[in-house]
Amino acid sequence: MSQAAGVEDVPPFDRSFLTSGCTFTRIGSGPLGGKASGLLTISRGLARLFHPEAFPSFAVDVPRLTVLGADAFGVFLRENGLFDVALSGAPDQVIADAFQRGSLPAHLVGDLRALTEEMRRPLAVRSSSLLEDARDLPLAGVYLTKMLPNNQPDADARFRRLSEAVKLVYASTYFRAARAYRAAAGAGDDEERMAVIFQEVVGRRHGDRFYPHVSGVARSWAWYRTGRTRPEDGVAQLALGLGKQIVDGGLSWVFSPARPKARPPFASARASLKETQTEFWAVNMGRPPAHDPTRETEYLVRAGLPEAEFDGTLGRIASTYDAASDRLLPGIAREGPRVLDFAPILVHDSLPLNGLVRALLLACEGCLGGPVEIEFALTFEPGGGVRFALLQSRLMAVSQQLVEVGEDPPPGWKALVTSRDAMGNGSTEGIADVVWVERRGWEMRRSAEAAAAIAALNRRLVSEGRPYVLIGFGRWGSADPWLGIPVAWGDIAGARAIVEASPPERGIEVSQGSHFFHNLAGFRVGYLSVPAGREGDVDWGWLEARAGAESIGPVRHARLEQPLLVEVDGRSGRGMILRREETT
């Protein structure tokens, strides 16, 4: 099925669909959008390519969902006179407020109201645009998803919250990050239309929190990977709670499906206390927060590992740190700090999760016709069963260009950046702009200031059609400003090589944001990491000597007379950003 498949291929929404046995229904007309089309293809193809009897420990499914066809998007804009503000370049909040004042098409209200009357579990209201999840134009993570508790006693209140969420997803089509992304990709705003997915949130309720025991992302091919693995080995990430922890670039457990028991890249077991997940996301099922329909996280809460242990959700996925031996002991039977390393599952084989993930990656490749990325959630059911829900599957862009990066630069070139932990694959030339965070006096508390300056420079360089190299400290795209610079993808969409240097004050593991790396792959962006102790692998002196460099807060921008060359060898993990030798 094509990415632009119509909703006519899906049965119409039945107002008793919870008991109808139908798992995929539609409201309205028009295309499904990329995300929904991919899910429909997978849900139909798994019956042919996946053999669940090989994994009797699991109940595998694609969660029940309903799609609001993309035609409603155009009707909503037209009937409410929103085209002018949508295309005005106004701030996100102005656009969001204008969309909230609009009314959804009257002919769809009955089905949407019935959806909230029938469905009393938490709902995810997700984007599914025409351009989203395309192999060559992946808008992963650019548009918004809103989670709703959907537990208000009043059906009218549930319907109002659903309507607000739809309008927020619609508005995000024209937010700054989305516009910048499309501009960098050469796609016009008039090419985009938005369908919307309503999907049950997978998880279980624990007091006022609703969340899955495990969320995960896995990729069958990994130019963007970690550890001593081959690209074809793929890579996977696991986290406690909602998958937002992973896709926002938060700390998660990263491993190769080919080597799930490999030792983590930490200097010691004690180091894992700082480099593994300590907080998780959940849907707030308790007292409603202050009403704010334009905030994506309005109904989400964050909690720590003590709360998870109280909920009883750590026992099968965590280990305990033993200070006396500097070791991690599987499980939580002993006293001590908890570490989310998923060792009971991955190392001690209490559940064949890794085998299931590998089988599903293979099946999804067969369905979609190439390397894939999947998102999933797992819950341990009260009766002893385990539910594995496949939430998303998308094609990945994979470069097969052959590049060899040696120890030394080729003749006539000098190394601006050298990395032994580079991600991506390929060669990019003709980059005549470089944007970097100044090293002297840098402190991570200035991350938000740096992010704003970089976003401003990115907008200008994208509008001028000038790709650039971006160099900074910590994890690009991290939601935690103490771990990295909190940019969204649209803030850096014009970069064609990104360098992640360890902050002067402490080392930080390489960034792992799922949607972030999907976009890197789609744009063929090289991602070069320079760890602590290898500060000399960035020629800071040459950067600081650029006469006439523009300054915006802690960020510098220089336009070069001689373009840079970026080379990344995906198989060896080596990369270089090269500058021409200067003649005197």
Task: Identify the role of each PLM range.
Residues 1-13:
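An acidic intrinsically disordered interaction segment
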Residues 52-62, 66:
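An N-terminal structural lobe/cap that precedes and organizes the functional/catalytic core
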Residues 10-54, 103-502, 522, 549-550, ...:
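Conserved mixed alpha/beta core segments that line enzyme active sites in large multi-domain catalysts
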Residues 503-545:
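Polybasic, proline/glycine-rich intrinsically disordered low-complexity segments
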Residues 64-69, 73-97:
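Extended, well-ordered alpha-helical scaffold/bundle regions in very large, multi-domain proteins
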Residues 60-62, 84, 371-372:
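Residue-level detector of short coil/turn "hinge" positions at structural boundaries
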Residues 93-107:
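Metal-assisted phosphate- and nucleotidyl-transfer catalytic regions
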Residues 83-89, 375, 517-522:
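A polyampholytic, Gly/Pro-enriched intrinsically disordered region
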